[in-house]
Structure formats: C-alpha cells, structure tokens
Amino acid sequence: MVMKVPIRTRLLWGTDIDDVQYPTREDFIQFCQAQKGSTASLQDLRRDHIEQALGISYQELKCWFEEYYTTPMFRALRPYDDAQRIMQLLLERGEGIVTTARPDHLRHKTYEALERDFGSRVFARVYFTNDHDNNPGAQTKMELCQELGVTLFLEDNLRIALECAGAGIEVFLMDQPWNQTDQELPGNIHRVKSLTHAYESMNGRH
C-alpha cells in the first residue's frame, strides 16, 4: 500500500511522457512483433535496456525506434485511459510541466500529440532534455526539476527516480517490468500501478 503524500498548495509538478502518459514501450514492442518478427513481450523488459530483450545491438535499437516514429502506429498512439482525467485533477492543484528524453526531431510531433490529447492548458511547458544517449552536455531531468522548483514528479525510469528522490523531489514511480529492483526504495519514491493510483495516494484529494 502506498503511503499518502500531502499535495502541496499550488505545487509545481512534473511528468515524463513515455510509459507515464502514453504506453509507448508497449506500442513499440507490438511494432517489433509485427514488423521485425520479434517474439519479445513487454514482460521480457526486465531492465531498462530494450535491446537485450530484442536480441539486437543498441545501434539497431535506435534505428528501429526511428522507423517506429514514422509509422501510423506512433501517430495513432493515445494516452493511458486515466491520463487525461488525472492530469486535469493535478492541474487544479498547480502547474504541470513535461520533461522528456525524446530526440529533438520529435518536438513537433510531441507538441501536436500533447495538444490533441490534453489541450493547451494542462502542460504549461515542455522540456526536451536530450539525455537519451548519455550526452555529457545534456541537462538531466533531476537538474531541470531542481532548477524549476518541481516538487512532485511522475516517472517510469528507476535511475531517474532515484536521482530525483536524492534531490528531495517526491517521485511516483510507475510500476513496470523494467524498473524492478531488490534494493529498498527511498521513502520519497512511491511505486504505483497507474496514474489513478498515484493521485489517490496523494493526500488532499477531496
């Protein structure tokens, strides 16, 4: 059971896009099955290295993702069923920002999708950190959240969650096969099954 965390008055909250707002990895795996003959499933992604589950190199993975980004599947990707409702509820509590490690060339498609699915008011700002390839010059999500004063963050990547938690940010970690760990999580990381679960664990819901 997740500890209830008080929602601060007029908080600045942040969220990742992929696998938090949209089931991107699940959709990508379906693309790999249909177009690449892969037999991997979402449950095979036990670590945050998709290429290992697919049995390909990291460079091949990047090429597969680039191909996926051009498909009707990616253009048709829609948010999780509860995403729009929960984001509207969080908007009543404060301002929301998006941080994503998506490549720069997806900016336009990303803005279009967020506008289409959430409207213009939910996410006041969208930041592309460009740290997907461990670019040494890129700003990390933790650094960005610290700079902006984000106090609550929704994420699916365990490493990023730990970094943010270490900086004193409250993190709601979406429970996924790739972020499982035997280590005990810090008290300000809360593993949740869905966005609804995350919101319901925040005190002050009513």
Task: Go through each PLM region and give its residues.
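Short catalytic/ligand-binding loop motif for oxyanion handling, primarily in non-cytosolic enzymes
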Residues: 22-25, 30, 105-109, 161-163, ...
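Conserved acidic residues
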Residues: 11, 124, 151
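Substrate-recognition element of Asp-dependent hydrolases with the DxDx(T/V) motif
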Residues: 74-75, 83-114, 126-129
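Acidic, Mg2+-coordinating phosphoryl-transfer loop and its flanking beta/alpha structural elements
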Residues: 150-193
